[in-house]
Amino acid sequence: MLTKNLLLCFAAAKAALAVPHDSVAQRSDALHMLSERSTPSSTGENNGFYYSFWTDGGGDVTYTNGDAGAYTVEWSNVGNFVGGKGWNPGSAQDITYSGTFTPSGNGYLSVYGWTTDPLIEYYIVESYGDYNPGSGGTYKGTVTSDGSVYDIYTATRTNAASIQGTATFTQYWSVRQNKRVGGTVTTSNHFNAWAKLGMNLGTHNYQIVATEGYQSSGSSSITVQ
């Protein structure tokens, strides 16, 4: 993430130097407006919940924390972002949420989290846009939970952004066949099914009900209970 942001800043500075002197001020104002229209990456506590928001800086995305476990996201022509509310650390808990999720293109609504030792990024996908996120991984099996069958996948990310900086790590995916926005996710059912397939989690880091967008537009309004 840091490297990409530095490259973007370098590219902007190079472009500014390439224009006539009388256009520099105008370009500077335009770049300032561009940087201000998207929410910067951040984490923390908000109204009794942990929140995490990360963006690669591409496109226009606005993340807003609301009361208690509520948040909204609006995005347009983004690169990649993921954000939401939940807990730090996470656990094998029942998670109830409600709201709306309307992606145009590639987006996911999921229980999303990380563990360490091993470093694992995991998704329990409740709904998605026009791309099934598991299709790029290795199919492992299924688990039935909360009124639907979920397909289980693994994938490996190499030299990618993680909670420990740039790293190589494994992703675990449960992707719901019958999409929904709202209900209770029994995370222990997924964690146990993964373990039976040799997909072991480590020590829980954060765990949120997340909206993610990738090269897409859309909006989301979610409340975690």
From Swiss-Prot:
Biological process annotations from GO: xylan catabolic process
Catalytic activity field: Endohydrolysis of (1->4)-beta-D-xylosidic linkages in xylans
pH influence on activity: Optimum pH is 5.0. Retains about 76 percent of its activity after being incubated at pH 2.0 for 30 minutes at 37 degrees Celsius.
Assigned EC number: 3.2.1.8
Assigned keywords, A-Z: Carbohydrate metabolism, Glycosidase, Hydrolase, Polysaccharide degradation, Secreted, Signal, Xylan degradation
SUPFAM superfamilies reported in the protein's UniProt record: Concanavalin A-like lectins/glucanases (SSF49899)
Every GH11 domain range: 37-225
InterPro entries assigned to the protein according to its UniProt record, in alphabetical order: ConA-like_dom_sf, GH11/12, GH11_AS_1, GH11_AS_2, GH11_dom, Glyco_hydro_11
A Pfam family hit: Glyco_hydro_11
Pathway: Glycan degradation; xylan degradation
MF-aspect GO terms: endo-1,4-beta-xylanase activity
GO cellular component assignments: extracellular region
Enzyme class of the recorded protein, top EC level: hydrolase
Main localisation: secreted
Propeptide: 19-37
Signal peptide, first to last residue: 1-18
Coiled-coil ranges per UniProt: none
Record-linked Gene3D superfamilies: 2.60.120.180
Catalytic residues, chain numbering: 121 (nucleophile), 212 (proton donor)
Temperature dependence: Optimum temperature is 50 degrees Celsius. Displays about 95 percent of peak activity in the temperature range from 37 to 41 degrees Celsius.
Subcellular location as annotated: Secreted
PANTHER family: ENDO-1,4-BETA-XYLANASE A-RELATED
Family per similarity comment: Belongs to the glycosyl hydrolase 11 (cellulase G) family.
Function: Endo-1,4-beta-xylanase involved in the hydrolysis of xylan, a major structural heterogeneous polysaccharide found in plant biomass representing the second most abundant polysaccharide in the biosphere, after cellulose.
Name this polypeptide is given: Endo-1,4-beta-xylanase B
Organism: Aspergillus niger
Gene: xlnB
